[in-house]
């Protein structure tokens, strides 16, 4: 391993390893080297890493970061990925949160293409957020960090609901849903779409309850007509009986769409697409394939 890849600099640190910019000495190509430390030889490779490897080996698409090589030693696992210049969060920070409408549309198209490809192959990403979307020098956007990804088959298995960084977590997951499918990723896509427009996270909650409250303030307190499955989740009774959830919060999104200048970048079609991604009822959210057919993608900016 050491002979083929020369580490150049540390570029990131995840929950179970360090990422380096490195050079493939045999080809002189710059790569990203994810080095995963194995806690003990008996424990072996972390299941998150095995999951990522098995998923990425199957996923070959222009909008998904490519796994080039896997090297395994007694106490270390190295995953070699194509190298990408930066992630979407850094890209937005560099632009001071001011992305132009054409860039937002192109990134959104790429994001949905990558998600559609995953979902067609029965893979949930489950942790879509700007730091997990990588941008190449040519401004191509690709999905990365499938550590939480899970092949879902028939989406009725019990999954852990502790997935997706809080700000991108759907209301059904916040209420403890463990039987979810592709709509959990679609909610995250909607949050990212809004963030690209306004230059800041749409729902920057401090905890689960605060997160849900921010969603209610933006979209309005849902009724059982708007969200039929609302009372069926494990935490529904506990969470929704809190005093702050008893008041009827009027939706502020209409007002914000009209008065927040950043939303004008999306145009009426973009706002309509955003609404269709951020639906309370999971089954009412557009699929990635449906979203790609939305008129927003025919608008010329």
From Swiss-Prot:
The active site is at residue 127. InterPro entries: CDK, Kinase-like_dom_sf, Prot_kinase_dom, Protein_kinase_ATP_BS, Ser/Thr_kinase_AS. The modification Phosphoserine is found at residue 15. GO terms for cellular component: cytoplasm; nucleus. This is Cell division control protein 2 homolog 1. It comes from Trypanosoma congolense. ATP binds at residues 11-19, 34. One of its GO terms (molecular function) is cyclin-dependent protein serine/threonine kinase activity. Keywords: ATP-binding, Kinase, Nucleotide-binding, Phosphoprotein, Serine/threonine-protein kinase, Transferase. The gene is CRK1.
